[in-house]
């Protein structure tokens, strides 16, 4: 992670605009923007142009950035005591990709970034991960398109639990209903049919859903 020990220096007007945008975006979406999203918002056609501004903000002590993560920007607080207090009450959960709630899509296992939440929200442990939902097949379970779901990593589940299931390298969120000769993954929307898995070699459970976070407009 890029970092600096220099004291903070005054920002230019452009740097301040982008810094404030990053703070606002992160607060509203529970994750930082990507370099491309920043460029699109400010009509900066070159990603190198955005990166140069981010590099200046890093050097001046306003942000950190993990170049290997698409959402690797971190806002730095200038209040050390406040930062320590916040850090002790929060935990960063990895976002490992998007998951289909509807027609399954190819699971993206590369880290998209992290989301910071209150430790009490999920009684968090180190084995929790987050995924972004795409689709409306679980709306009657209170899981909507664009929601961020939280799942505890585990390879088994009880009948009727909501799981993140992987089928042939694809991932989907469904109710888990196993039987002797197959697994039925049931949606929570009458528009969709259950997914029947006959060959268990192509099926695995990645985790059990334990929470959901939604952006409220």
Curated annotation (Swiss-Prot):
CDD domains: S24_LexA-like (cd06529). The keyword Lyase does not apply. It comes from the Bacteria. It catalyses: Hydrolysis of Ala-|-Gly bond in repressor LexA. Its EC number is 3.4.21.88. Residues 35-55 bind DNA. Coiled coil: none annotated. It is an enzyme of class 3 (hydrolase). Pfam families: LexA_DNA_bind, Peptidase_S24. Signal peptide: none annotated. GO terms for cellular component: protein-DNA complex. One of its GO terms (molecular function) is sequence-specific DNA binding. Keywords: Autocatalytic cleavage, DNA damage, DNA repair, DNA replication, DNA-binding, Hydrolase, Repressor, SOS response, Transcription, Transcription regulation. GO terms for biological process: DNA repair; DNA replication; negative regulation of DNA-templated transcription; proteolysis; SOS response. InterPro entries: LexA (IPR006200), LexA-like (IPR039418), LexA/Signal_pep-like_sf (IPR036286), LexA_DNA-bd_dom (IPR006199), LexA_repressor (IPR050077), Peptidase_S24_LexA (IPR006197), Peptidase_S24_S26A/B/C (IPR015927), WH-like_DNA-bd_sf (IPR036388). The record marks 101-102 as: Cleavage. The active site is at 137 (for autocatalytic cleavage activity), 174 (for autocatalytic cleavage activity). HAMAP family: LexA. Probably represses a number of genes involved in the response to DNA damage (SOS response), including itself, recA, uvrA, ruvAB and ssb. The probable consensus LexA box is 5'-TGCAC-N4-GTGCA-3'. In the presence of single-stranded DNA, RecA interacts with LexA causing an autocatalytic cleavage which disrupts the DNA-binding part of LexA, leading to derepression of the SOS regulon and eventually DNA repair. Belongs to the peptidase S24 family. Homodimer. This is LexA repressor.
């Amino acid at each position: 992670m890029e970092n600096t020990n220099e004291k903070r220096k005054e920002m230019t007007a452009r740097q301040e605009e982008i810094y404030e945008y990053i703070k606002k975006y992160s607060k509203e979406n529970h994750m930082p923007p990507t370099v491309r999203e920043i460029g699109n918002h400010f009509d900066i056609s070159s990603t190198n142009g955005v990166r140069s501004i981010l590099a200046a903000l890093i050097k001046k002590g306003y942000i950190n950035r993990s170049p290997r993560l698409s959402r690797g920007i971190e806002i730095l607080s200038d209040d050390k005591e406040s930062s320590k207090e916040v850090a002790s009450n929060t935990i960063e959960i990895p976002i490992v990709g998007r998951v289909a709630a509807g027609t399954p899509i190819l699971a993206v296992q590369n880290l998209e970034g992290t989301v910071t939440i209150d430790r009490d929200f999920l009684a968090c442990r180190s084995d929790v991960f987050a995924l972004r939902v795409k689709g409306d097949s679980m709306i009657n379970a209170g899981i909507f398109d664009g929601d961020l779901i939280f799942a505890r990593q585990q390879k088994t589940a009880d009948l009727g639990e909501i799981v993140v299931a992987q089928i042939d390298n694809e991932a989907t969120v469904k109710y888990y209903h196993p039987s002797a000769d197959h697994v039925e993954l049931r949606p929570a929307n009458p528009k969709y049919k259950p997914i029947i898995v006959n060959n268990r070699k192509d099926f695995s459970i990645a985790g059990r859903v334990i929470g959901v976070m939604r952006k409220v407009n």
